[in-house]
Design a protein with these regions (language model features):
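A feature for the membrane-embedded catalytic helix bundles of lipid/isoprenoid biosynthetic enzymes
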Residues: 4-5, 18-77, 154-305
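Conserved small-residue-rich
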Residues: 57-110
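Membrane-embedded alpha-helical segments that form the functional core of polytopic membrane enzymes
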Residues: 90-146
Length: 305
């Protein structure tokens, strides 16, 4: 029957190995309509949906790191609304973020406790706006490839400027050279992004980068693992089986930009630049090894598949 067309289509996609994922509805409505009465009832329910709120919730990522999720995304939606009402473009927000990062670098270069505190506050606000520009682009549907590229370039530039300013400020106040640590942190970050970019080029999503399973007959039981063949049994696989704590731990161990921002904003004012760089190098080294191992394992799996 026509009412089951969606279910049959989804079944065919999944059993053909096409990657699909569930999208949370949030405050939106999505129901199967089988008759006129159900359609009229659903139309009445749709009238009460706050479309702006739904678009705002959809614009905020749910797969960010711990710091970004709780210290930024928990309240950045208010800034997105204000920016949209002020008719700011995502690129304009990116520019303001860069300006705040420049102010943070000036304060960091002072090397004093007050300078480090003020710099940390400005750098945090810069990161907040760095998240807001992408959220605004998704909320207003005005995102562009140029804006995404510009945002990425500015992210790296802001971090490198902060590292350089911290090193300069520490040398001015303490008379000690921590530039080797700062340069090491920059090189490690550049290496991590090179690894990620090389992997993305080797397995682009539009040319087989997304993991595809083998085609399978529609007559096979739904819980039979296609990788095990007809004699195999289903086995828990994928993110659906991972404990939430493990997911959060994996997001933190790779030291994403949110956690790097947290290290700069929290460690620098308390322990100053030297300890900040040591934390970034130690944590970044672990993250690089973890990421490299993961890329190798995934590459081997895809080569076998």
């Amino acid at each position: 029957p026509a009412a089951q067309a969606g279910e049959l289509l989804l079944t065919g996609l999944v059993r053909s190995g096409v990657p699909v994922r569930a999208v949370p509805l949030g405050p939106l409505h999505a129901r199967r309509i089988a008759d006129r009465a159900a359609a009229e009832a659903e139309l009445a329910g749709l009238a009460g949906v706050d479309e702006e709120r739904a678009r705002l919730e959809a614009a905020i990522k749910t797969d960010d790191g711990v710091f970004t999720r709780y210290a930024v995304s928990s309240w950045s939606g208010h800034l997105v609304r204000l920016a949209a009402r002020a008719k700011l473009t995502p690129n304009a927000v990116t520019g303001i973020s860069v300006g705040l990062a420049a102010i943070a670098a000036v304060w960091f270069s002072a090397g004093t406790r007050i300078g480090l505190l003020a710099g940390a506050a400005a750098f945090y606000l810069s990161f907040v706006l760095d998240c807001v520009d992408g959220q605004l682009a998704r909320f207003t549907r005005r995102g562009t490839a140029l804006g995404s590229w510009l945002d990425t370039i500015c992210d790296r530039g802001k971090e490198f400027a902060a590292y350089a300013a911290l090193a300069a400020g520490y040398g001015a106040v303490h008379g000690q050279d921590v530039w080797p640590l700062a340069i090491g942190a920059m090189l490690l970050l550049a290496l991590r992004h090179a690894i990620g970019s090389a992997y993305a080029d080797a397995f682009p999503p539009d040319r087989g980068g997304a993991r595809r399973g083998p085609a399978r007959s529609l007559t096979l039981p739904y819980d039979l693992d296609p990788y095990d063949g007809e004699a195999g049994g289903g086995r828990p696989r994928g993110r659906a089986r991972r404990a939430p704590r493990l997911v959060w731990a994996r997001r933190m161990v790779v030291l994403p930009i949110g956690e790097r921002t947290a290290v700069i904003c929290l460690v620098a004012p308390v322990f100053e630049a030297r300890v900040t760089f040591l934390v970034l190098l130690a944590w970044g080294g672990v993250a690089t090894l973890y990421m490299l191992a993961g890329r190798i394992v995934r590459s081997l799996r895809r080569a076998e598949g």
